[in-house]
Amino acid sequence: MTQQAYEALLNDVAAALDIERVETDKSGGFVLELDGSRWVSVAYSTPEDKLMCQLCLEATLSPDAETLRYLLRQNQFIAEYEQQHFFSLIPDIQQHNNIVVALLRLPVHNMTPKIFLQEVDRMVSRGTAVESWLLQLKEQKEAAPAAIEQAALKA
C-alpha cells in the first residue's frame, strides 16, 4: 500500500468513526484526533507495527467478519494474533466493528504481538460490555482444546 493510499484509507476510517482529523507525524505514521483534545497514535516504526495499523483500518472498512479473517490469514505476523486470541471467533458485524474501534484506540506504536495481547487483556479486565464479550471469547477459545480432547476420549 502506498503512502497516499494509506492516508486516503485513514481518512475514510476517520470519517466513519467521527474522528476529527488525521495527520502525518515525523515518523511517517499517523495520529487520529478523536474529540479535539485526545489524540491516538497509529504511528509505526517497524513493519509489524504498520501491519497492525493496517489490519485495524482494513477491518474497519470490511463488510463482515469473514473478510477480517481473510485479511488475517494473508500475513503470518497477523495470523499469530488469530491463533493466540479471538479474531477467528467474531460472530457478527456489530461486534466486529466494536472490537476494531477498541483496537484503533490502542497505541500500537512499537507493540510486539506479546505487548499487544497484554494490552488487550488489560482492556478486557476493565469489564465493559465489549471487553466482557472479548473475555468470553478468549475463555471459549482456551477451553476448545480441552473439549476436543474430552470428545476424543469418549470416541
Residue ranges and their predicted role:
Residues 40-61:
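A short acidic-to-branched-hydrophobic micro-motif
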Residues 34-35, 46-48, 95:
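A generic beta-sheet turn/junction motif
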Residues 1-41, 84, 92:
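Charge-rich, low-complexity N-terminal segments
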Residues 30, 49-51, 98-100:
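Hydrophobic residues embedded in beta-strands of well-ordered beta-sheets
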Residues 7-22, 55-73, 147:
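Charged, low-complexity, helix/coiled-coil-prone segments
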Residues 135-155:
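Short, highly charged C-terminal tails/helix-capping segments
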